[in-house]
Amino acid sequence: MARHRNVRGYNYDEDFEDDDLYGQSVEDDYCISPSTAAQFIYSRRDKPSVEPVEEYDYEDLKESSNSVSNHQLSGFDQARLYSCLDHMREILGDAVPDEILIEAVLKNKFDVQKALSGVLEQDRVQSLKDKNEGTVSTGKIAKGKPVDSQTSRSESEIVPKVAKMTVSGKKQTMGFEVPGVSSEENGHSFHTPQKGPPIEDAIASSDVLETASKSANPPHTIQASEEQSSTPAPVKKSGKLRQQIDVKAELEKRQGGKQLLNLVVIGHVDAGKSTLMGHMLYLLGNINKRTMHKYEQESKKAGKASFAYAWVLDETGEERERGVTMDVGMTKFETTTKVITLMDAPGHKDFIPNMITGAAQADVAVLVVDASRGEFEAGFETGGQTREHGLLVRSLGVTQLAVAVNKMDQVNWQQERFQEITGKLGHFLKQAGFKESDVAFIPTSGLSGENLITRSRSSELTKWYKGLCLLEQIDSFKPPQRSIDKPFRLCVSDVFKDQGSGFCITGKIEAGYIQTGDRLLAMPPNETCTVKGITLHDEPVDWAAAGDHVSLTLVGMDIIKINVGCIFCGPKVPIKACTRFRARILIFNIEIPITKGFPVLLHYQTVSEPAVIKRLISVLNKSTGEVTKKKPKFLTKGQNALVELQTQRPIALELYKDFKELGRFMLRYGGSTIAAGVVTEMKE
């Protein structure tokens, strides 16, 4: 065969006559220059001298925060001080102690350049002083001892002896005490090991060295400086100050007598939620004319002139391009008696999880409905978001509702159309659990701004409507009772990296209060950290309380371990995390009966977690809560039941009886909400 002939006729001599050396390259035959060798070739003989790297110690950060608190600065000045310190540490590193940097910043009135110049000049003078002292001490040594005895010290090393130093009242072995020439760097004295003859000569020479260096470095300098730097007095003092704060009095002082209220705007997609609230913010003066003019021009170029006011709250390019709100937009405005935190929730069915996140943080709600013919019916009938949003906010604890009947100008402010909408909606909201006294209907027009911040003067409306405008109705809402006396709880809604050290989280404080310098515990990661700064409505503050939407700057923890949905609490009274819990659920309008092993999506605060219904324990009476049936085979629409759920990952939960805000959740399946529930018992 042909392939056999190729093998038998192969000339192997051609392979053996190959003169190429494959073990080295062609260039290795030539000499390499010393400069090239020094630049590109590694020599094992010349071992680089590696200096010991100082470990990051959290106590240093704690001491720096304590030193800042000793100066009793205001919240704004403290934020400026932290900013200056971060800038100076980027240039100087950790070579200069925080106390020196703080004194320099305060002395130069927060001018970073002057403070840096002062610190560098101080270090230069100190280094010259140390150099002069070193030459004087070596001169004294040369006089007190012959040169031969000094050179003979390099023959063998001195045997070190263990030195014990007292730190914070406890005796600990800190290192070795070696006789040698003492020197000073940055205010800390230390001993340098030197070589010398056997022990007898070493002791004799060390006596001379000690007498020579007595004036420059006393023998107890290390111990004294360590005791002074490790004194925990600032920590105790700051703790006492935190305990003495009267949170209720500070709340009144901070708000100027105005009460805080968290408002969420909900409704069917394209009902005009963003336009309505954006126009209200513009009329209140929160948006200046220049910015509004820019939005008008940009929306005209995009072919969406009517979306100009919506762009006040829809800030991302994708939201503006698609013309729908996708994430919860947050801003602040004030009424006569309230400070309102406004949350504009998305209305599209695909973004219901984001809407649940916003509704879970709200105290009251504004439900926006479209008064146009056919549009209201599309949003209110089966498949529309008006019904689902109403059920969601009621299930998440919202009891006060203002219904803004929007786009009334398109139906010429007809009283019949307004009464038709209020009749249908009023009946549904009453079934959902809202009291008639807590629901108000206001005719509005988001595009023209009619009946938003002032009562309408249009004759078509005033001839049959004599009620409040939308802003007056929002101002008349009653704020809920804040849980300031309960342990601290904050649910994370966003995590991001800050420019300085540490990272930032945002969220609403559900209970308790917090101050800068406090220690926090994150659950379920079970990691601790320290609050470096607090920001409320883009302004740095010293503390925040329940109901506030804040941004916290945290240090002492890795950002990778924190996710959206984590809950921060006090280390003394932590929140529990579990994967199995029992709950009482109310089932909505569902097509498929719920059975054992039914998969659901659990929405809790800002968490969205897959879960499974492990057990159907009993069916309960809606009004009395009594057990009507034990161990049911399935659950259908409208039933109230006790079930056991299991999640894939641990979730930090609270019992509904202890924390109502943190005891509610929603269950969704197949893109629709199927049940609302409250936590009754945690299993594991």
Swiss-Prot record:
The modification Phosphoserine is found at residues 49, 67, 117, 127, 152, 154. Residues 130-241 are annotated as: Disordered. Transmembrane segments: none annotated. Residues 445-447 are annotated as: G5. It comes from the Eukaryota. GO terms for biological process: nuclear-transcribed mRNA catabolic process, no-go decay; regulation of translation; rescue of stalled ribosome; ribosome disassembly. Keywords: Acetylation, Cytoplasm, Elongation factor, GTP-binding, Hydrolase, Nucleotide-binding, Phosphoprotein, Protein biosynthesis, Translation regulation. Residues 267-274 are annotated as: G1. Component of the Pelota-HBS1L complex, also named Dom34-Hbs1 complex, composed of PELO and HBS1L. Interacts with the SKI complex. GTPase component of the Pelota-HBS1L complex, a complex that recognizes stalled ribosomes and triggers the No-Go Decay (NGD) pathway. The Pelota-HBS1L complex recognizes ribosomes stalled at the 3' end of an mRNA and engages stalled ribosomes by destabilizing mRNA in the mRNA channel. Following mRNA extraction from stalled ribosomes by the SKI complex, the Pelota-HBS1L complex promotes recruitment of ABCE1, which drives the disassembly of stalled ribosomes, followed by degradation of damaged mRNAs as part of the NGD pathway. Belongs to the TRAFAC class translation factor GTPase superfamily. Classic translation factor GTPase family. This is HBS1-like protein. It comes from Pongo abelii. The lineage of its organism: Eukaryota, Metazoa, Chordata, Craniata, Vertebrata. The gene is HBS1L.
